[in-house]
Swiss-Prot record:
FAD binds at residues 4-34. GO terms for cellular component: cytosol. It comes from the Bacteria. This is N-methyl-L-tryptophan oxidase. SUPFAM superfamilies: FAD-linked reductases, C-terminal domain (SSF54373), FAD/NAD(P)-binding domain (SSF51905). The modification S-8alpha-FAD cysteine is found at residue 308. Monomer. Belongs to the MSOX/MTOX family. MTOX subfamily. Pfam families: DAO. Its cofactor is FAD. Its EC number is 1.5.3.-. Catalyzes the oxidative demethylation of N-methyl-L-tryptophan. It catalyses: N(alpha)-methyl-L-tryptophan + O2 + H2O = L-tryptophan + formaldehyde + H2O2.
Length: 372
């Protein structure tokens, strides 16, 4: 059988692509080296932020607004356990923060619902938060967080119900191109398709070593917290920048545990074996202490944590482009630790590519040619 589309990597983007392409009537094969959702990539750990007024640059805003529409649609499949939780996101940092300036600019350009608070206003709204006098907060009332593993599980189930073929726990070992399309090699045999999507995450260079993607080991952890820090008490998700420039992110507490991680830093790795479990690097359990001590002093001890991997591009912007010399293969990689919120729209973009549809978005900033 020759498929219309083969998807290599069925984590966040691949799961979405499999669903949207199958829903569009294509004959699709989803593949993954493991059984998604799993612990080997970048999507585990229960939750991921979704922010609309984007501190990484306004080029992302049209994408994230479409992503939000698709997340809302997906959430309707799980109304008892919603995939998207509109908790709001408070972005904290010094008044001269470049990141916050980008957030404010994005909000102004796209007329997003963002409220600016000074230090006293932040602490009056959320007494659990402490910030210096020179800090400001930009509160995105319509943003929140996503249940990442539930989202992937839902997409995979919906795709399967729609007739999508799925080959999991079976790594793709090679990709070949010829006049007839794309062929992948696996331990289960060879499979052919007219087109392919490569969204293999951290270890995409095992297949395409020429790509400018660097895996980085990252950790996040859950800390003891009480009901004051919960969604029920209107405690928001958050990003926070310390005076030294370190960037943190976190979520409202669930079951008396608040999850937090540090966005920058981490350990450069070159193989999956180097991504050692949480606590095997001395700094893992204390990485969030500078933020917690200064901004959330009421949070208790570290309960447990996990390690994941970022697939960083050189400029930490996404790579969305066809494979050089092969216009029938789309790459979606280099998501650099801020990609999950876009998984829905990136999956839709992949499905449009498979149908020869022109994208509704300007993807020029994400081309590989910027690294030449």
């Amino acid at each position: 059988m020759k498929y219309d589309l083969i998807i290599i990597g069925s984590g966040s983007v691949g799961a979405a692509a499999g669903y949207y392409a199958t829903r569009a009537g294509l004959n699709v094969l989803m593949t993954d080296a493991h059984m998604p959702p799993h612990q080997h990539g970048s999507h585990h750990g229960d939750t991921r932020l979704i922010r609309h007024a984007y501190g990484e640059g306004e080029k992302y805003v049209p994408l994230v607004l479409r992503a939000q529409t698709l997340w809302d649609e997906l959430s309707r499949h799980n109304e008892d356990d919603p995939i998207f939780v509109r908790s709001g996101v408070i972005n904290l940092g010094p008044a001269d923060s470049a990141f916050l300036a980008n957030v404010a600019h994005s909000a102004e350009q796209w007329q997003l619902n963002v409220e600016k608070l000074d230090a006293q206003g932040i602490m009056a709204r959320w007494p659990e938060i402490r910030v210096p006098d020179n800090y400001i907060g930009l509160f995105e009332t319509d943003s929140g967080f996503l249940r990442s593993e539930l989202a992937i599980k839902t997409w995979i189930q919906l795709a399967k119900e729609a007739g999508c073929a799925q080959l999991f726990n079976c790594p793709v070992t090679a990709i070949r191109h010829d006049d007839d399309g794309v062929t992948i090699e696996t331990a289960d045999g060879e499979y052919q398709a007219k087109k392919a999507i490569v969204c293999a995450g951290t270890w995409v260079k095992d297949l395409l070593p020429e790509l400018p993607v660097q895996p980085v080991r990252k950790v996040f952890a859950w800390y003891q917290a009480d009901g004051r820090y919960s969604v029920k008490n209107k405690f928001p998700a958050f990003t926070g920048e310390l005076p030294n420039g370190d960037q943190y992110y976190g979520f409202p507490a669930e079951n008396d545990a608040l999850k937090i991680g540090k966005h920058n830093g981490g350990q450069v790795i070159h193989s999956a074996d180097e991504r050692v479990p949480f606590a095997e690097v001395v700094s893992d359990g204390s990485e969030a202490f500078p933020f917690l001590r200064n901004v959330l002093p009421g949070i208790g001890c570290c309960l447990y944590g996990a390690a994941c991997t970022y697939d960083n591009s050189p400029d930490e912007d996404f790579i969305i482009d066809t494979l050089p010399g092969h216009d029938n293969t789309l790459l979606i990689t280099g998501l650099s630790g801020h990609g999950f919120k876009f998984a829905s729209v990136l999956g839709e973009i992949a499905a449009d590519f498979a149908q020869d549809k022109k994208s509704d978005f300007d993807l020029t900033p994400f081309r590989l040619s910027r690294f030449q």
